[in-house]
UniProtKB/Swiss-Prot annotation:
Subunit structure: Heterodimer of a common alpha chain and a unique beta chain which confers biological specificity to thyrotropin, lutropin, follitropin and gonadotropin.
Keyword Secreted: yes
Role summary: Promotes spermatogenesis and ovulation by stimulating the testes and ovaries to synthesize steroids.
GO biological process: G protein-coupled receptor signaling pathway
PROSITE patterns per the UniProt record, alphabetical: GLYCO_HORMONE_BETA_1, GLYCO_HORMONE_BETA_2
InterPro entries in alphabetical order: Cystine-knot_cytokine, Glyco_hormone_CN, Gonadotropin_bsu, Gonadotropin_bsu_CS
Disulphide-bridged cysteine pairs: C29-C77, C43-C92, C46-C130, C54-C108, C58-C110, C113-C120
Cellular component aspect of the GO annotation: cytoplasm; extracellular space
GO MF entry, a single one: hormone activity
Signal peptide positions on this chain: 1-20
Protein name as catalogued: Lutropin subunit beta
Alphabetized Gene3D superfamilies for the sequence: Cystine-knot cytokines
Length: 141
């Protein structure tokens, strides 16, 4: 009986290993296409731009006894390599710099979230919400 249980366990483990080696059920951390709303205080317009951002699944762990042991650091999908592109917002009044920069993800990684450079919160309910009217044209510089 023990031998049969051992063979069954071995069979289940070998099938699980083959299943786990395939493409993950959740997409891993990687650059994806996204549309961002860009506006600036003092300029009466909002422009949407197409860029790449980091998104996807990063494996994390939680302690079972959370009250006894300190929490484990959690990782997020964040930029590894990034460049910034700039656009000129049309219609800005004299004295207001019309240039606005936005990130373009070149590669991503799972790592700690640095609040100084990233939004560490969850997804926004309205990521394309603007305070000003939207324009459809872009001026890349």
């Amino acid at each position: 009986m023990e031998m049969l249980q051992g063979l069954l366990l071995l069979l289940l483990l070998s099938m699980g290993g083959a299943w786990a080696s395939r493409e993950p059920l959740r997409p891993r951390c990687r650059p994806i296409n996204a549309t961002l709303a860009v506006e600036k205080e003092g300029c009466p317009v909002c422009i949407t731009v197409n860029t790449t951002i980091c998104a996807g699944y990063c494996p994390t762990m939680m302690r079972v006894l959370q009250g006894v042991l300190p929490p484990l650091p959690q990782v997020v999908c964040t930029y590894r390599d990034v460049r910034f592109e700039s656009i000129x917002l049309p219609g800005c009044p004299r004295g207001v710099d019309p240039m606005v920069s936005f990130p373009v993800a070149l590669s991503c990684r799972c790592g700690p979230c640095h609040r100084s450079t990233s939004d560490c919160g969850g997804p926004n309910d309205h990521p394309l919400t603007c305070d000003h009217p939207q324009l459809s044209g872009l001026l890349f510089l």
